[in-house]
Amino acid sequence: MNLIYVTSLIFLFSFKSMAVDVHLPSAGFDCSDTNNKFEFLFDRSKDMDNPKVYRRIKGKFVLIGNLLAEKQGAYVIWEDKYFFTTTDFAWTFDKVTSKLSSIILSVGLGTEDLSKIPKPMTCMQKIFYY
C-alpha cells in the first residue's frame, strides 16, 4: 500500500514539475545595429504590476531585472543587472520611434569599460516562442 502511495506521489510531482517548465509566447523586442543584437522579452505571467525582463544571452533568455517605468504608447525603461557588474544600467525603448537607448543610473566602482555601451538602435516588436 505504501509503495503505491509513494509511486503515485512521484508520478504526480513529475507532472507538476513539467507543467512549470511550459512557457507561453511572450512579447518583446529584437534590437540590432551593425555591431550588436539584443533580444528582450517581458514576462507578466506571475505579476502584471512587476514584470520580469529577460535578455537572450548565448542562445538562452536570462533574467536581467525588472521593468522600472512604462507609459502606454510612449516609453519603457528596464534595468539590466547583467550588462555590468557594479554599474547600475538600464535600457529605454521609445515606443514612438522604436529606438532602444541606454542609461547609466549610477557608476559603482568605476572599473568597467563604459565604451561597450551600444549606440541607440532600431527595434522591432516580436513574439518569442521558447
Predicted regions and their residues:
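Contiguous, well-ordered beta-strand patches that form the walls/edges
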Residues: 59-97
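N-terminal glycine/threonine-rich, aromatic-flanked beta-hairpin/loop signature
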Residues: 38-70, 98-110
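Short, solvent-exposed loop/hinge segments that bridge or flank secondary-structure elements
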Residues: 25-56, 83, 87-95
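Edge beta-strand at a domain terminus
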Residues: 106-130
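Classical Sec-dependent N-terminal signal peptides that target proteins to the secretory pathway
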Residues: 1-21
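Tryptophan-centered short beta-strand motifs
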Residues: 21-23, 61, 114
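N-terminal helix-cap/turn-to-beta initiation motif at the start of protein domains
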Residues: 18-30, 128-129
